[in-house]
């Protein structure tokens, strides 16, 4: 697409499914261009150093020459110049950013050809929707630079109220994790950066991440407006101070979840074209069991951690088959808590060769979990409304002083007429959806086992916050992974009491948006049937592993008498707290009456 000399588009976003071989096809394309000896000059940006080196070697192997592609991610001023000897340069996305913000090196990013028009820039896995950089308290404590102890980098958005900033500081002190987007440079940032670089106690990975973060901060703190697309744990700046994009040659971005990403909608329409690719994968052999629960965010296991993690481990045991590799994805601090339990032999994790760990922010594009047929997530990424507000405003550019001072008079409507609150909400829900899709596609589901694109039989157990935001994200996941087997399980709770279980059910029904009828149906079909359905699902899963294409093996259905029995049990539980339940039932268009002394639920229409 972008190799035509007179192409009018400066930027194309190619949206294809995770695991469909985008990088492989990119390698073949560039290798064949080298083999055919075209006059193109190519620049490729990819997230990781080792991947850049591997990509360059693979391109040369297909091109049949060792002098077509070269991986360069150093910091020398001429490191990014496209020379005649190596028509194709492969660099890291972070190196691309550094050169983009360096006046002396910016010109070297232009992949000019012989006629200064036939250049191509390809950015692999860059337009991921919005995350934040996180620093753990343990990492920060190893940096002895005499800096303030409360927080290293301060929030700088006037949109944050004083209480929001205080909450962020308290969050950092209590959990060791703080969200740093957007923000201003701390007065001691340069000293901190030097301390990090010189420290022998800080590992190289953290040094690399922190350096990239500081570079991002400097761009935010500049006097000019910089537009960012933030990837999982990394920042990618494609637009600088000018109103026009910096990319003056055709560029292509490959992204698996662009449809869920609000950022592409905020980019200049005259210079950006979104190119969706038809889905090619069939998820009919995958089962996603959603554990609906209150408080499944990153702090969900913060109190009474031992008991909570033990409960999660016991609960998911029935979905883990001993002869099947299992991946566990969580926050890094949750993993540390699991390891503490392991030391006391409460649970066994690290010594189990069939268990693989991964943590949020380090999963994008990885293939090391592709042999795992089970996936369990402990806790779930969560971002506050203040974070989404900050992100939206950061994408629009740095605000004026008048905007900062006049909070009551701000116009929260974008150029397309959409209300500001709707965009902020969509950004948050898209983050949920994007994260779970990326996680699921790390495991064996990314393989094809038939000509129809069927994936292997996999089982995913996922905790999900019981609120409307998570529900919207879940619908986005269902839309993207159309025929995945989705099972709601409201039976999981950190607490074991019946009172907390009922409270959770009412919370789910109160804050879950329409269609309420579907929620009620899933509630009936999954929570009150208990262990019998779990056993049936597990038996079906085992049978399908033996013959994944057996048409006669269908998920267990509930017969009409069983439905009536479940309705009666649900009515009995809700009737214990009719004051709270009245509003819920009205919203669901359900009456609760007593018949022969027993509570009964009546659907109005």
Mark where each language-model region is.
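ASCE RecA-like P-loop NTPase motor cores
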Residues: 1-605
